[in-house]
Amino acid sequence: MVLVKICGLMHSEDILAVNTAGADFAGFVFAPGRHQISLEQALSLKQLLHPKIKTVGVFVNEPVAEILAIYQAGAIDVAQLHGKSTPAEITQLQQAGLKVIQVFERQAIDLTSMADYLMVDSGKGSGQLLNLKAIPHISRPLILAGGLTPLNVRQAVQLVQPTMVDVSSGVETNGHKDADKITQFIQQAKEDIIYEDIK
């Protein structure tokens, strides 16, 4: 069954929503943007999070030392790396105990990446859906992100068969996380796939 990451969590009610809906991963954005939170906020939110839900820190070209400081403070279990990351940097994070997600645009997936997961994204926070049929089937753990909503995630899972799906703005209403949309998204993503349904 596909795993689900809800990203861009900022408030206690967001945490309550992912706890109730049964997300697998919760994303905290440390990179600049409208979802950015501080280490202190992340630690407070993590205390409210169900212990089975892993936390992912989202970074854009962040120095390894800064990522490790956030990990060592206890805020994250996984580092999601946008921008340029060298194999040495990824290995350094992994040796410290972090799992690593490396983010690529569809045309530029590096199958030799040292990361634990490869994420295919249509662009940071763009809300645009990828051309799903153009995503190559790969044997590496793959995360699908970008433009997913409760209305299209089931078809996306059927077409791409990713390890995980990742959503942020697709479960928001007026710029805030919507508990009903989070529940619907997770239910649709994890629904048993009937391949005859694929058109």
Curated annotation (Swiss-Prot):
HAMAP family: PRAI. This is N-(5'-phosphoribosyl)anthranilate isomerase. Keywords: Amino-acid biosynthesis, Aromatic amino acid biosynthesis, Isomerase, Tryptophan biosynthesis. Pfam families: PRAI (PF00697). The keyword Amino-acid biosynthesis applies. It comes from Lacticaseibacillus casei (strain BL23). Pathway: Amino-acid biosynthesis; L-tryptophan biosynthesis; L-tryptophan from chorismate: step 3/5. The gene is trpF. Transmembrane segments: none annotated. Its EC number is 5.3.1.24. GO terms for biological process: L-tryptophan biosynthetic process. The keyword Lipid metabolism does not apply. Belongs to the TrpF family. One of its GO terms (molecular function) is phosphoribosylanthranilate isomerase activity. It catalyses: N-(5-phospho-beta-D-ribosyl)anthranilate = 1-(2-carboxyphenylamino)-1-deoxy-D-ribulose 5-phosphate.
